[in-house]
Amino acid sequence: NRRERVLIEDKTFVIQGHKLTQEKAKGIVERYLQNKAKKYIVPRATGLAQHLGVAGDITDIRFRKTKTKWGHCTSKGVLQYNWLIMLAPNSVIDYMISHEVCHLKHMDHSKHFWTLVDSVCPDSDRFIDWLREHEHRLYF
């Protein structure tokens, strides 16, 4: 039973597996990032929601690859994250988590919303700028 695995060496993915094709390697990396997203984002999102008093408002946390959004919060309490965000620095991931969880309190981008975001994630402008500058590098 040959095992598939992903190693990261010097910011490079090293994919190990039996009879690897480009498509198979891509699938291995996608599953790796999805699993990493679940392990990293879910506890942080639920912890922040608990801190903000909105943990009961989360009905689900989902992960999917989207073309234009890094995250989304529905009016029904579903938090959705693009698992490609796991290729960003942890500080940027934490900003995205904060942004979507704060929508559970404010379903808009009002002054109240941004004040709340800044209270749990200071310097959020820096992370927004990072995403604007580097987001094209995170897609594959």
Question: Can you describe what each PLM-predicted range is?
Answer:
Residues 1-95, 104-140:
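Active-site-proximal or metal-binding-adjacent scaffold patches in catalytic folds
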